[in-house]
Amino acid sequence: MTNHMLDEVRSAAVAAARTARESYRAGKIQPTAGVAPGMTQANMIALPRDWAWDFLLYAQRNPKACPVLDVIEAGAYHTVLAEGADIRTDIPLYRVWRNGRLVEEVADATPLWQEHPDLVTFLIGCSFTFETPLLEAGIEVRHITDGSNVPMYRTNRQCRPAGRLHGELVVSMRPIAASRIADAAMISGRFPSVHGAPVHVGNPEALGIADIHRPDFGDAVRIESGEIPVFWACGVTPQAAVMASGVPFAVTHAPGHMFVTDVPDSTYHV
Amino acid sequence: MTNHMLDEVRSAAVAAARTARESYRAGKIQPTAGVAPGMTQANMIALPRDWAWDFLLYAQRNPKACPVLDVIEAGAYHTVLAEGADIRTDIPLYRVWRNGRLVEEVADATPLWQEHPDLVTFLIGCSFTFETPLLEAGIEVRHITDGSNVPMYRTNRQCRPAGRLHGELVVSMRPIAASRIADAAMISGRFPSVHGAPVHVGNPEALGIADIHRPDFGDAVRIESGEIPVFWACGVTPQAAVMASGVPFAVTHAPGHMFVTDVPDSTYHV
């Protein structure tokens, strides 16, 4: 590919990310798997300043589940990950949490920043980042094939606590053909800041998952004959901590409805 | 190697780390390059609680220079990285900083924890971790050959600031034969949480290094004909931030005199 062609591909990807964010700002709601391919997507959690230290420490102690890509300081809503973006409006769907309970889903979080002007926002790596490399290697990603949301599960594994925060690990699942599991592990493993290699392959019961066809978040997907469920640490883990710890107030993205950045996936490749 | 042999090798490595820490606790002072081969070593900085958020954010924003391996909460001095270790005594040499100036080097930091009972301690990845894999690949590590401290340099590259903290990037340097630079980059790149791949190869002037034979920290090393200086982000970067930002009080390790943990280097391999 010539430099000129490469520039055009990059510009098109950034433009796709921008267009997606603008459509969400205008009110469109959709899961973001497969949106703006090649651009990194991020999980979001915003907490009052008083909780920011506990959360950043929780993330540091659980880096596979909570790899922090950016922190937006108290009251601010711009990020270095996407020029001109507004974190209060540019995610397709938000969840509002009060005293550890999900109370509402909204498409525009601006009023919540007015209610809590000191929110500190954390943007956390998302496994969607390594889905493009998986697809490029000829590994099917079922929820993209089917146009659905990735299935996510609460597990019986406790994260390492920090301050007032504790909770269980949440995982995402992709069914992978037995012959491609090693490839999927190696490819995703080269992206440690967006969850990296799988935490578990097969045997959902060992993670405390009673029914693989009934995820706690997102949509169930087909598991074909010859495929094994493969589990990756998931950026919904902070929402589990909000629930388990009874955090007084938090705003998060809705699972699968991510913040689409202007950062190419390749940035996180080691 | 049989399982039994592997267990013995591991036990010997943990024992070597423990013996090293005990000797430092007893007062021995030495640079730790090459000590307890295969066990991860860490940079240390302890700051009053009021500065902890700024520092953790600074580390998150400059992950190549400041990859956080553990945070010890206010007033505590034990770490999950080394059972039974005491962070106040088990580093061979400490530096004491007041108002951004180095005022003292001490072998026992216990009185400083009495003076500031709310110190939060950060343990940060160290490039010594990938030196064993470099040696195993037949790449000479000059400062280990010569039994000296690794040379470190302040650069003209500013880190991304956080709160009250700003400062320049500090780098370590290893001269590498031209034919092995790609290997050294790939091998170290597989250890992203201990500084990862080099930030710069050759051309010290571009980093603002006036004289490669006069490092700002550590010892000068020979650069043989056919070798190129290769630069990695360095965990002394927090000390540069302490100086540049005039931090009122901090305790750090002395450059090259690291905290030797019980964690095998391979833990940080992706």
UniProtKB/Swiss-Prot annotation, chains A, B:
Report the top EC class in one word: lyase
- Sorted alphabetically, which keywords does the UniProt record give? Lyase
Q: For this protein, what is the EC number? A: 4.2.1.-
Q: Which InterPro entries match?
A: D-Glu_cyclase (IPR009906), Putative_hydro-lyase (IPR038021), UPF0317 (IPR016938)
Q: Which GO molecular function entries does the Swiss-Prot or TrEMBL record give?
A: lyase activity
Q: Which domain of life is it from?
A: Bacteria
Family recorded in the similarity comment: Belongs to the D-glutamate cyclase family.
Name of the molecule in the record: Putative hydro-lyase Reut_A2449
Q: Which organism is it from?
A: Cupriavidus pinatubonensis (strain JMP 134 / LMG 1197)
